[in-house]
Amino acid sequence: MPDGIVNLGYGAFEECSSLKSINIPQGITTIESNVFSGCSSLENINIPDNVTSIKENAFRGCMKFQEIKIPETVSSIGNWAFSSCVAIKEINWPDKVKNINDYMFDGCKQLRKVNFPKDLKSIGDSAFGE
């Protein structure tokens, strides 16, 4: 994607099942709802350090993700953001995000390691459910 892009709208790449890799431009500060939802072949994504928010369902159903590197600049992540990402094995949780919302990692059957921040406040309904 060109570096000049400053907005990825709701569902911009939703269900792009052949998409394998993407670099999010530096101008993006929010990953909107459903932007990459259902991108079942997406393996690699580079989230830039200036992203502060990941909305609900942003990566839901990205079944090839094995590891997600969430920048420390992120302060909020919506419900179901990574649900049904069945291959995720490890998550590095940013210190600024104090809540793991409802269904955040629902269906992430391979998840083995989550690095929680010291001051995590809450874990929502079925956050790690099946």
Kindly give the residue locations of the regions a language model identified.
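Structural signature of tandem-repeat unit edges
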Residues: 1-7, 17-30, 40-53, 63-76, ...
